């Protein structure tokens, strides 16, 4: 099974929202790309997935989340990181993310409890870490390739990736041929820049295999925040905290981490939420 994506528009939107430096755009872009594909691989329409990579690099934690259509959102703790390029002239994603830490994967599959998995960071380059997650946590042989090409003006030129997973019945000939194809495959952004589309890329990495396109999606960078969600989050703070906010500030602002949208609440609105909080407490058995 193969999932592939041209995530240029998604990563571009993330860069515009978070105003990331080049290396952080590459890091967050890779994680957004992987998360979108992993979300689209979920079977239930209402399923969702969240990835968090928490390394010891200057970028801090990166968090992304996607629905089953591949629509994705994300943010990074430190959006601006300036570090030297690697010796080969490429962006040092590993240097920004760090080599020590963990990759966490949380899947909401509509069950009582979400599935939680985590693995130590393998390389900090994101793709290798995704591959390690599938091998260790889900025991699925996987190839993951991710790429983000950033222009000198910090805009995103190309971004994309693919995930290949072997079926349990795959024989050695299939595995050997796939390994050969992957080794000679050009970087995803190189293929996109040359004019290849996603189907071309899949056919390239699966050369020698019969390729059938099962379905296509058009995922976007899409935030799920709303005023109602923010109100529920505020209520969860408790009436004491809300009363304090109402007394101290004439207007309170709450900013969404994923899209930077600001929600404003007057002190009267905060007091009303506090009353709702108290009512909720009163009706508890």
Where are these regions (language model features)?
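Interaction interfaces in information-processing and related assembly proteins
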Residues: 1-215
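Cys/His-clustered metal-coordination modules, chiefly Zn-binding fingers
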Residues: 183-285
């Amino acid at each position: 099974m193969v999932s592939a994506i041209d995530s240029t528009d998604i990563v571009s939107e993330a860069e515009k929202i978070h105003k990331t430096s080049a290396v952080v755009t590459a890091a967050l872009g890779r994680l957004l790309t992987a998360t979108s594909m992993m979300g689209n691989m979920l079977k239930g329409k209402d399923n969702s997935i969240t990835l968090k990579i928490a390394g010891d690099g200057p970028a801090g934690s990166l968090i992304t989340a996607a629905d089953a259509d591949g629509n994705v959102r994300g943010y990074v703790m430190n959006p601006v990181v300036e570090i030297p390029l690697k010796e080969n002239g490429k962006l040092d994603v590993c240097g920004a993310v760090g080599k020590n830490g963990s990759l966490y994967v949380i899947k909401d599959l509509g069950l009582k409890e979400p599935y939680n998995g985590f693995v130590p960071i393998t390389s900090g380059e994101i793709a290798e870490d995704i591959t390690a997650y599938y091998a260790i946590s889900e025991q699925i042989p996987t190839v993951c390739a991710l790429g983000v090409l950033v222009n000198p003006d910090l805009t995103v030129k190309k971004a994309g990736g693919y995930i290949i997973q072997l079926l349990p019945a795959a024989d050695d000939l299939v595995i050997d041929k796939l390994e050969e194809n992957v080794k000679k495959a050009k970087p995803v952004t190189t293929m996109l820049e040359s004019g290849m589309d996603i189907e071309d890329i899949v056919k390239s990495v699966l050369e020698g295999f019969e390729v059938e396109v099962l379905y296509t999606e058009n995922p976007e960078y899409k935030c799920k925040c709303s005023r109602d969600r923010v109100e529920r989050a505020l209520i969860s703070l408790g009436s004491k905290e809300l009363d304090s906010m109402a007394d101290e500030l004439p207007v309170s602002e709450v900013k969404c981490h994923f899209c930077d949208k600001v929600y404003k609440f007057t002190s009267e609105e905060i007091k009303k939420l506090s009353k709702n909080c108290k009512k909720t407490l009163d009706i508890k058995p």
